[in-house]
């Protein structure tokens, strides 16, 4: 399945990266998927389309995000939520009249899978501790890039690995957010986990040895 952008912003926009990502999900075929860092929901829609093609309606997607504008968050590294393309700005502001980076905006994009999707607004440092990880099979971690946030997110998702699931972390090689790599390296070393650095050092794929 090819990765589609759905006329929105996505952090997996570089050529081939989205397709590579979907191939990773395809190889595992999870029924319960958690994404930390939903952004405009493009990756969420692609994941739902893929899981539907594999399992029909027998899948669940859980998405967690702050759902705040980039200029509202000074302490974190997140993608710019503003469009560079004026046509997209006009479409969402004046035609669709919806903020694509909002719970409502993402729900609109995912309405086809309304019964399969749960969106949670909040800080992963607080919310992840409340999520039952026992049934989650795959985690895509692309939330806060601060060292402490990444470490918190990894620790909270550790049960997924114990149950033979996978955590795929984005931005392992992001030079202006070194806390991502530092947290992943320390977490995998401490817990004696297998960590593959893939897609030209972009993703860190973590699982049990």
Short names for language-model regions:
Residues 2-11, 15-209:
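S-adenosylmethionine/decaboxylated-SAM
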